[in-house]
Regions:
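Extended beta-strand/beta-hairpin segments
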Residues: 1-72, 83-174
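Alpha-helical metal-binding/catalytic segments enriched in His/Glu/Asp
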Residues: 75-79
Length: 174
């Protein structure tokens, strides 16, 4: 496992590369999600494969975490990793770090019961628990800097354009 010095060296090299040629850091990420039995999906992204499902109370079999768990995990893990990256870059030691992601919801929107209720979260917040020998000012600077450059935090806080493209393949009649 790389230590903070190794992480800083790698990140400094990446920063230099994208500073010299922005195109090095630009691209499009593609994740494929396939429907499986019932309310289960299989996610495929490069070498990674994992399942997503729904609980029994929504008609699933509770065989995998639901999309909300992965969404909250995406934000929380992005924050934890970002704090680690910026700690290495700024030289701020972290002895322990946990991020809790809280999301308020009303399932009436998602289930189409009430059109005035949003199908997504009504509010989100995160709580950072951090232990460090650094001063409170240094830790606050670290957290503020990492939050400013957190990609998932940014995706959630601003409206990212989202479009849908559909390809319909009709089954041959027998």
């Amino acid at each position: 496992m790389p230590d903070d010095n190794e992480i800083k060296t790698v990140l400094d090299r990446v920063v230099k590369a994208v500073t010299l040629r922005a195109s090095v850091g630009q691209g499009t990420a593609v994740t494929k999600v396939h429907k499986r039995d019932g309310l289960t999906a299989e996610v495929e992204d490069g070498p990674w494969r994992f399942s997503v499902g729904m609980s029994e109370k929504y008609g699933g079999d509770n065989s995998a975490p639901n999309p909300g768990v992965y969404g909250r995990a995406a934000l929380g893990s992005c924050l934890v990793i970002g704090y680690g990256m910026w700690a290495a870059r700024l030289g701020v030691p972290i002895d322990a770090l946990t991020v809790e992601v809280h999301a308020d919801y009303d399932v009436r929107g998602e289930l189409g019961v009430e059109d005035k209720v949003t199908p997504g979260y009504t509010a989100m917040r995160y709580v950072v628990h951090i232990e460090s020998t650094a001063s409170a000012a240094e830790v606050t600077k670290l957290l503020d800097t990492a939050d400013k450059y957190s990609s998932w935090r940014d995706d959630i806080m601003r409206a990212v354009p989202l479009t849908r493209e559909v390809h319909i393949n009709t089954a041959a009649k027998r």
